[in-house]
């Protein structure tokens, strides 16, 4: 199950295709196109009118407030979302003071890390007691060099056989080959950011997982490893990646844990992630809604065996 917090409207068509069984894929939720300052939401009435499009036409429950303007404009977003029963999520914007107003004013989620590497009890308790979802997206952490490019260099995703199966080779290479943004190890402050995330979770706060979309599939594993780098236990990292994500989407009654009455979604690993969180990639099987898939190929193995359809770039005419 995924939620794209910034996408073109066609993502809702893709979501319908997956739900109807006409194509393979995860459950897809999205905010649709984010709202920005260029949308000129200069009155409450205009703000509500724009959000009604998302509620009535896109049939989504989520809206991305992408730095729509001053605090009053952001509050209009929250007020209109509440009236329309939408979940307003917001962009962090690399501004800690603004992030604090996001929490105080009532956004359901703050996405991207606080740029300040060290946070203290006041900020920790504010995030924890407000019940806001904090999705730090450490791969593109604010306030310092981006760990994403370090992963590109060290993990060499272009040589990953699974990624090569599910990505056109030229696209995979173009997305991951850059080594331009190189920094000395001591310049990175992601471990300190991760320590702050861990403080909020230890205080009872809600931490969710987000990979930013720069390297789909494996990016969430990298994000999990970064969460662990700041001292978060492997068990808590797994909670962030499962039940906490379901809570962030308002779907915890149906997803996020293995319980009676929930949808049969699970992942079977070959190695224990509680011993080493990097074992999270040792996926043998994936089950979605009771259908079991090979973790390597996504061929169906239960209750019926069926090979996945070849993607267009593997067809003969594209080779």
What are these regions (language model features)?
Residues 7-17, 67-80, 118-129:
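Active-site-adjacent beta->alpha loops and helix N-cap segments on the catalytic face
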Residues 28, 81, 110, 134, ...:
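Divalent metal-coordination and catalytic microenvironments
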Residues 218, 233-238, 248-283:
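Acidic, glycine-enriched loop/beta-strand segments at the rims
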